[in-house]
């Protein structure tokens, strides 16, 4: 057993064993030792209990004070305040800094900010530290007394450069409509000290909110170049995506073990369908999610048809086979999970169905798939077009025309394929 762990274990065991005895059988010194040890080990509940026993047995108010400090450390501010006030009542001492700090916390939590501020000024006379300035500045900020809050928080920030006080200063700048100074401070801090994941995210949100994406790009580019780790790359990529600089985002993403779906999105955004198809295939192999098998097939189709050519039947067959496998596996998963089909399922059904129809592979079966798509998304003009095209292929032009009559003319004109199909169907005499 590690020596340090062993010591802690023995100390805990000793503490437990002694407290199992009646407190009265232990000497006052022993109880002080045990309570102090518990406090310094972070066991504030045991420390509070120990000091309260000492107070009850001896009536020495110093133990009530220690119990108050333990309760405050535990987060039990109600008990801490009760004991702090008891201490003041018995001793008539209103200048004890530890007790007054407890009361400040209590007043602040109860929303009695004026009382907390008044007491803090008293504490500052005894203990003028930057930590006290920070608390006082924060209390002024909650009251929106910005002229008093800023110098205190600024003084604290300039010495410790922590993110909490940074955020408070930026808040003040924004409340005073000094956006540029707030953003400059944010950028300057990240340039000098970097940022935690939380601050980086807040910074990105802030830059985006104020439509300062170029400033965000400069900030996160420098951060990434200075320290090219996953987190910094992630935020830089986020900015590049917002700016639609997908190629640069892709180059960086390829250097890190991000979720493959990020690269998939970047490839599709750039219409790099061959790479998107390969990426979807890798995701399918890793996650066994049939949706990615379907995407692999569709992106492969897009990559082959990118040269504005119509695919041959032989080229379409493996694409159709993968889509059929994807829909079959998807049904098996849904049967187990009891989940419902969604709009992406509808998309796959329509793509598969239309392919079977358009290439005269199995028109009726293709129409069945299209009907499944329409059952999930009845308002899709693309799916209605697929069904109409199926009727046309079967020679039922009357039904095909009927379906097209339900589609708004604007929608038909907006889609070249619908426009072409409509023209052919309207000219049909069958």
Model-derived features with residue positions:
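Alpha-solenoid helical repeat scaffolds
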Residues: 14, 24-362, 370-371, 375, ...
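Classical Sec-dependent N-terminal signal peptides that target proteins to the secretory pathway
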Residues: 3-25
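C-terminal structured "cap/appendage" subdomains that terminate the fold
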Residues: 397-398
């Amino acid at each position: 057993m590690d020596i340090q762990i062993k010591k802690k274990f023995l100390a805990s065991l000793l503490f437990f064993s002694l407290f199992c005895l009646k407190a009265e059988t232990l000497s006052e010194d022993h109880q002080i030792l045990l309570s102090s040890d518990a406090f310094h080990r972070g066991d504030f509940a045991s420390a509070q209990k120990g000091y309260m026993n000492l107070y009850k047995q001896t009536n020495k108010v110093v133990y009530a004070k220690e119990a108050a400090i333990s309760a405050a450390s535990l987060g039990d501010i109600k008990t801490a305040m009760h004991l702090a006030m008891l201490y003041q009542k018995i001793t008539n001492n209103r200048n004890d800094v530890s007790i007054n700090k407890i009361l400040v916390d209590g007043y602040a939590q109860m929303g009695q900010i004026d009382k907390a501020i008044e007491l803090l000024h008293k504490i500052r006379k005894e203990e003028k530290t930057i930590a006290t300035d920070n608390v006082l500045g924060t209390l002024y900020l909650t009251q929106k007394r910005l002229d008093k809050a800023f110098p205190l928080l600024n003084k604290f920030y300039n010495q410790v450069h922590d993110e909490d006080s940074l955020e408070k200063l930026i808040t003040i700048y924004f409340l005073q409509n000094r956006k540029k100074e707030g953003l400059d401070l944010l950028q300057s801090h990240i340039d000098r000290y970097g940022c935690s994941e939380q601050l980086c995210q807040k910074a990105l949100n802030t830059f985006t909110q104020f439509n300062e994406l170029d400033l965000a790009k400069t900030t996160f580019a420098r951060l990434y170049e200075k320290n090219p780790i996953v987190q910094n790359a992630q935020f830089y990529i986020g900015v590049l995506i917002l700016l639609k600089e997908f190629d640069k985002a892709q180059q960086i993403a390829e250097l890190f073990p991000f979720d493959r779906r990020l690269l998939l999105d970047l490839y599709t955004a750039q219409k790099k369908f061959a790479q998107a198809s390969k990426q979807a295939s890798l995701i399918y192999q890793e996650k066994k999610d049939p949706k990615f098998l379907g995407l692999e097939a569709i992106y492969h189709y897009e990559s082959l048809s990118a040269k504005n050519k119509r695919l041959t039947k032989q080229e379409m067959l493996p694409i159709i086979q993968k889509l059929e496998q994807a829909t079959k596996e998807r049904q098996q998963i849904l049967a187990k999970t009891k989940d419902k089909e969604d709009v992406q399922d509808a998309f796959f059904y329509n793509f598969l169905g239309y392919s079977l129809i358009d290439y005269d592979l199995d028109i009726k079966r293709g129409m069945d798939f299209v009907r499944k798509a329409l059952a999930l998304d009845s308002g899709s003009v693309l799916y209605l077009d697929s069904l109409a095209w199926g009727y046309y292929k079967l020679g039922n032009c009357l039904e095909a025309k009927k379906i097209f009559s339900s589609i708004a003319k604007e929608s038909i004109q907006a889609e070249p394929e619908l426009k072409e199909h409509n023209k052919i169907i309207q000219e049909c005499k069958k």
